[in-house]
Amino acid sequence: MSDARAPLSVVIPTLNAAASLAPLLAPLAEGAAAGLVREVVIADGGSDDDIAALAEGVGARFVAAPRGRGRQLSAGCAAAGGPWLLILHADTRLPADWQGAVADHIEHHGGAAAYFRLRFDDRSAPARFVAGWANLRSRLFGLPYGDQGLLVPRPLYDRAGGYPEIALMEDVVLVDAIRRTAGRGALRSLATTVETSAERYRRDGWVKRGARNLLTLLRWRLGADPEALAAAYEGRGRGLGQGQGRGGA
């Protein structure tokens, strides 16, 4: 899955995510066949599943990195060779029209970053509320989270300083830097919606998980250490698995 003429390098951080990747890799392979996707970079944080073999089997580039999504994304983006980066979580599901939305942005908004609208694989009222809040937050405050994906031109990514090598809040740090570097207009919403897993909300409860997300963001804004936040957020002795970090709230 490599075409040096295509513009888009897709970077996916993983941690024991081999079983969940197939539904994401299939549309990316279609994007490669269409001349949009240049490469897929899997930035792994020390999985004990067969992710390396899976990457080799589908023609993706495998990058081993220290565990922690910020560190993995920093390594994956450093290894990527395309003029555009698309960062996706392993449990993201792309819509049928994703290629058109991404290609349109690349053609008409070459200096700006973009994110997808969000929904969950759950059609309950709490799921719709949390996704609606995430989309409103992104529009009003220019603050999409990582599970909405991030499409960014390499020059803007580099000017903004790239992903910080921290365990949590790496997505917030980067979009904050993009706004400071290039202004609010440099962060746009794509005209389509990705779907992400609601498992973490179903496990913890929609209210509890949403409140925890907001409290974590507030503590970060007040200067809390991201490593301490990650430990408190995920619980002592539990790691930050890919696709199981903060959600739409």
Question: Positions of the model-derived regions?
Answer:
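Cell-envelope/extracellular polymer assembly enzymes that use nucleotide-activated donors
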Residues: 7-9, 39, 173
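Short aromatic/hydrophobic "clamp" motif used to bind/position activated sugar donors
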Residues: 85
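Short beta-strand/loop segment that forms part of the nucleotide-sugar
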Residues: 25-29, 36-46, 63-65
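Short, well-formed alpha-helical segments that are part of the catalytic scaffolds
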Residues: 16-32
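Conserved donor NDP-sugar-binding/catalytic core segment of glycosyltransferases
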Residues: 96-126
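Hydrophobic helical membrane-anchoring modules
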Residues: 1-3, 176-249
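A conserved acidic beta->alpha catalytic loop
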Residues: 44-52, 92
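A short, conserved alpha-helix in the catalytic core of glycosyltransferases
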Residues: 156-160, 166-186
